[in-house]
Amino acid sequence: NLGNPLPLIREQLLKIYKEHPGLQVASVTTTGYGEDLVKNAFRCDYGLVETVAHFTAAKYFMPDVDFIIDIGGQDMKCFKIEDGAISNIFLNEACSSGCGSFLQTFAQALGYDVKQFAALGLFADRPVDLGSRCTVFMNSSVKQAQKDGASIENISAGLSISVVKNALYKVIRASSPEELGRKIVVQGGTFYNEAVLRAFEKEMGVEVIRPDIAGLMGAYGAALFGLRQSQKAHKTASAMMSQKELEKFEQKVVSVKCGGCGNHCQLTVNTFADGRKYISGNRCDKPVTGKSADDSLNLYAYKQQLLAEYKPVAGKRGSIGIPLCLGFYELLPFWWAFWTKLGFAVHTSPVSSRGLYLAGQATIPSDTACFPAKLSHGHIKALSQMQLDAIFYPCLTYNVDEGLGDNHYNCPVVAYYPEVLAGNCPELEGKKFIYDYVGIHRPKDFVHKMAKDVLPKYFGGISEREVQAAADAAYAEYEAHMAKIRVKGSEIIDEARRQGKRIIVLAGRPYHVDPEVNHGIDHLITRHGAAVVTEDSISNRVQKFPTSVLNQWTYHSRLYAAAKYCTTQKDMDLVQLVSFGCGVDAITTDETREILQEGGKLYTQLKIDEITNLGAVNIRLRSLFAALDERDEVAAEKAE
């Protein structure tokens, strides 16, 4: 559809009307990536997230299905089914390697069309072992296989096996085929490929059902959903445009930048012939309703408000700059109180923005760092342009000990990124940049270190007694700050329950509160009608418990504790935010998933970086809410 599905769909709808004069359409449901646009453009009745559409279709063909796998051209969806409801959803993340386009690309590179290439794979006598790595590595593996004299048949079969192994062991991360189930429906256009189908059956050790409309299962599921909804509502006629209206249909598209808030979203405004408009690209409802988002049940917004209250207080000793990034999203109250008590005016860098990120981009030494770390370069750049006596960003190996883990480290990036900044930011030359190694986990040692080692290097005339008083103020401010978060979290939970709303623990690190890092995902959740709390607002409700991994980081100990607590609350679910490039999260995601699944909860992971398109994020969130609704419906039916 070349990025615009409307002309194509209009053409097909007119064709249907012309071939079936007098046809009465009972209901129309849209699904897929263009769902909202198509629904609004043609006044369709319902919209359905594609994951649920595929699930609905699969259940029609096999009512007792326990596993569904859908491999399309660019994405992959897998569902584990228990007691007739979705118990787990797996979606591929940023990379589309191992999907249909992956096979098509290789077929074309080898001089075949994809159907011919697939057919050859069925006659392989010795499929090449190409592993299940990404396309870049696979390219070199295929070339090596050709050099070794492998036939096209064996290469085709090897690639089909790779697609299957990628799905099973990289996306789903199954330890064995048996754990997935025995009653399996496969769908998606990729399964029209007979070699992929056969490879899947051989790997799983069972025969599976592939409907002859495998590539249209989403559309079929949407139709079944529409049928059910119209029957429930006793509707016999759809609200969709008539033939005459379709013939007059026009669409004008304009791209504008929203000035409603600091997000400056790039909006796409579709205007239709009858004057209606459809706006996309917005992270909140303000461009549509003219009203700001309701943040009364959003703890992320509350935490942002708390941090905004820390303004500079004029002091006798000068000014200190603190970058509002990484660990300072939690420790700003501590360091603000410490330096203010010592007589310094504490200035923070501006709130993160796209412009601030781009301003510091030239000094980022490695693209493998997580986005929050990359942002810190922009914060340092901003501070360097302010008239400050010093910039303060200490190295902190340890975090506070909350008694939840085996140790209480900061991750290497949070702990030591000041070293990277000192070595790569030329704007710090000639500036007083304080990035000494400090530990706040031992109050007595902290006072001694600051009074005897750190402060004398940069400032004179500060006594140990003053440092002790400043430290006391800092610890008290930090405790008060964390207490406010826990109290507000409790208030939000109580109010959400009073209103009958779902509660989502949007769990990550303190710096995921940064709007430029989370891209407004908290608002996306509240727009779905749920309340948002954070992992640090509920982690104190759980005692230390055994984990499958070494539990040695403060932030991650909270994450595990929050996941554990969620399993005890019927109306609470956890969504984990993960920054691309985070090595530690390779461990935490599996552990968090395990904790939630053992407690009968769904696990949802959202990977985020500098890319602001939330289309895939919205699909995951809608899939979560739809799966939870499905569970409730199944439970209610059983209770009856």
Where on the chain are the PLM-derived regions?
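An N-terminal assembly and electron-transfer interface module characteristic of large anaerobic redox
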Residues: 9, 95-103, 110, 213, ...
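Adenine-nucleotide phosphate-binding core of ATP-dependent small-molecule kinases
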Residues: 140-169
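Glycine-rich phosphate-binding loops at beta-strand->alpha-helix junctions
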Residues: 31-34, 162, 175-203, 214-215, ...
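Conserved phosphate-binding catalytic cores of ATP/NTP-utilizing and phosphoryl-transfer enzymes
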Residues: 11-12, 35-72, 77-85, 175, ...
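Conserved ATP-utilizing enzyme core subdomain
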Residues: 97, 104, 108, 113-146, ...
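Phosphate/pyrophosphate-binding loops at sites that engage ATP/ADP/AMP, CoA/4′-phosphopantetheine
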Residues: 12-26, 167-180
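Short glycine-rich phosphate-binding loop at a beta-alpha junction
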Residues: 22-32, 178-189, 207-210, 320-324, ...
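Short glycine-rich, Thr/Ser-proximal phosphate-binding strand/loop in the N-terminal lobe
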Residues: 1-15, 88-95
